[in-house]
Swiss-Prot record:
Active site per the UniProt annotation: 57 (proton donor/acceptor)
Similarity remark: Belongs to the TAL/TAM family.
Protein's name according to its UniProt entry: Tyrosine ammonia-lyase
Stored InterPro entries: Aromatic_Lyase (IPR001106), Fumarase/histidase_N (IPR024083), L-Aspartase-like (IPR008948), Phe/His_NH3-lyase_AS (IPR022313), Tyr_aminomutase (IPR022314)
Keyword set, alphabetical order: Isomerase, Lyase
Binding of substrate, residues: 87, 200, 305
Substrates-to-products reaction catalysed: L-tyrosine = (E)-4-coumarate + NH4(+); L-tyrosine = 3-amino-3-(4-hydroxyphenyl)propanoate
2,3-didehydroalanine (Ser): residues carrying this PTM: 147
PROSITE patterns, alphabetized: PAL_HISTIDASE
Protein function: Has ammonia-lyase and, to a lesser extent, aminomutase activity. Catalyzes the rearrangement of L-tyrosine to R-beta-tyrosine and S-beta-tyrosine. Does not accept L-histidine or L-phenylalanine as substrates.
Molecular functions per Gene Ontology: ammonia-lyase activity; L-tyrosine 2,3-aminomutase activity; tyrosine ammonia-lyase activity
Length: 533
């Protein structure tokens, strides 16, 4: 059900969360009348300048390396339509419906600032499509990230004039013209500058990035939830999350929030050993000896102890990336731009380097989130590390039964895959367009890489979650779990039974990964009275 209050597309106050909500159909979008008035005024002033027959890029000139060609303004519509048709050359699988809708919202917001000098009708057509559920079919491959996301945005823009293809409800595509006829929607007739303004910007990478920020936010919370359950399965310690060590000693905001979450998730657990208890046990075992092994570890391995330092750093990275994306979202990333004082700016605001860097950074952070999860999974399964639990958490007939041995392999493989994918796309500039575009950002590639890593992580986390539940049950410790842990355990067991004998596991893993994609564990612990930061 859509949010009661539509979101304003005003060019200045849009947030990534709001873009995600509109993209997912949870909220409607409107352009306030004063904004449309400002856009109309800007267009009128721009038309006065253009009428003076002065050279304006993309209005009275060719595009890119063809800029030296004078084009009479009488050919304005043909020039814009030719631009869209020629740049509808994307290839590969299509972006999802939500991703394309996010692109459309981002582009509408950039145009709503007024500096791109389009008519209000252009923005209104984008919003009309959003409201009607008409979503362009946009191939994923083809953007260089400067001049913006030309190829994917061309596949969006071409549908506004009744050409190209749109997505159907069954996941296929249909000619835009047919769909518009069925809906009674009139195609837009472009005027000069408007085709260029629709595609010459960063709205594809920015729109996709808005969704990725939301995904990582839920993922880091669920990583903390699963880590807490793994700690209980291994009978570890919560002392490493003491507030003093974070709030006072190392006050990175993300680390502080992560440590607070771990304290909340582990509160009232009877499965954990404190530093005082471990110290006393060490002294008892040592007796009068001055140098002797006791078998008591008063500190645990880093994957159990440094959760706030690692996941907190992921949180801080997420915050930084969100700042960059929100700033880009509310920017005029077009060329040329036209200002209230009559100045024309021929520049390069279409360059997506900021978003490209941010998405590469997000990909690196997400990769490390997966790494620490996989290492805890290894600790749960290894008979040398799992606190005397059965090897590979096999419930019976160790040796005859393999337990979770095979389930570790996809997690290990996905870590290697993530490490390969997270190599920065933002440094992979390849000159193009007759060396006019001689340095490009590859920002949409960076966003697509980050998306793939985040999806891989859902499987890694699902495996850690299943192993943690198995460990708690094998240890006979379910009733000793913290309230959060018991709630999560019950949620999992309602869907995936205890691994008593070896069985086909793919369906179990897929089921858990699907629930993690929905952010299900955040709601589970909320139901247990815990609101995570």
């Amino acid at each position: 059900m859509p949010h009661a209050h539509p979101a304003d597309i005003d060019g200045h106050h849009l947030t990534p969360d709001t873009v995600a909500a509109i993209a997912r159909g949870q909220r409607a979008a409107i352009v306030p009348e004063p904004v449309l008035g400002k856009v109309a005024d800007a267009r009128a002033r721009f038309e006065q300048v253009a009428a003076a027959n002065v050279p304006i890029y993309g209005v009275s000139t060719g595009f890119g390396e063809l800029v030296h060609n004078w084009v009479d303004i009488e050919h304005g519509r043909a020039l814009q339509e030719n631009l869209l048709r020629s740049h509808c050359a994307g290839v590969g699988p299509l972006f999802s419906r939500d991703e394309v809708r996010a692109m459309m919202v981002a582009r509408a917001n950039a145009l709503a600032r007024g500096y791109s000098a389009v008519r209000p009708a252009v923005i209104e057509q984008l919003l009309k499509y959003l409201e009607a559920g008409i979503t362009p079919a946009v191939p994923q491959v083809g953007s260089l990230g400067a001049s913006g996301d030309l190829a994917p945005l061309s596949h969006v823009a071409i549908t506004l004039i009744g050409e190209g293809k749109v997505l159907t409800e069954d996941g296929g595509t249909a000619p835009t013209a047919e769909v518009l006829r069925e809906r009674g929607i009139t195609p837009l007739a472009l005027a000069y500058k408007e085709g260029l303004a629709l595609i010459n910007g960063t709205s594809a990478m920015t729109g996709v990035s808005c969704l990725l920020l939301e995904t990582l936010r839920a993922q880091v919370q669920q990583a903390e939830i699963i880590a807490a359950l793994a700690l209980e399965g291994l009978s570890a310690s919560a002392d490493a999350f003491m507030a003093h060590g974070h709030d006072i000693a190392k006050p990175h905001p993300g680390q502080i929030r992560s440590a607070a979450n771990m304290r909340a998730l582990l509160a009232d657990s009877a499965r954990l050993s404190g530093h005082g208890e471990l110290s006393a046990e060490m002294k008892t075992r040592a007796g009068e000896a001055k140098n002797t092994g006791t078998g008591v570890f008063i500190q645990k391995a880093y994957t159990l102890r440094c959760i706030p330092q690692v996941l907190g750093a992921v949180r801080d990275t997420l915050d930084h990336c969100a700042t960059v994306v929100e700033r880009e979202l509310n920017s005029s990333n077009d060329n040329p731009l036209f200002f209230e004082d009559g100045e024309l700016f021929h520049g390069g605001n279409f360059h997506g380097q900021q978003v490209a860097f941010a998405m590469d950074f997000l990909a690196i952070a997400a990769t490390q989130l997966g790494v620490v999860s996989e290492r805890r999974l290894n600790r749960l399964l290894s008979p040398h590390l799992n606190n005397n639990l059965p090897a590979f958490l096999a419930a019976a007939n160790e040796g005859l039964s393999c337990g979770f041995a095979g389930a570790q392999y996809p997690a290990t493989a996905l870590i290697a895959e993530n490490r390969t994918i997270c190599s920065p796309a933002s440094i992979q500039s390849v000159p193009s367009n007759g060396d006019n575009q001689d340095v490009v950002s590859m920002g949409l590639i960076a966003a697509r890489n980050a998306r793939r890593i985040l999806d891989n992580n859902q499987y890694i986390l699902a495996l850690e979650l299943l192993a943690s539940c198995q460990a708690a049950e094998l240890a006979g410790a379910v009733e000793q779990l913290a309230p959060a842990g018991r709630a999560v355990f019950a949620f999992v067991r309602e869907r995936v039974p205890f691994l008593s004998i070896d069985r086909y596991m793919t369906d179990d893993i897929e089921a858990m990964a699907a629930l993690l994609r929905q952010g299900a564990l955040v709601e589970v612990v909320r139901g247990a009275g815990i609101e995570l930061a």
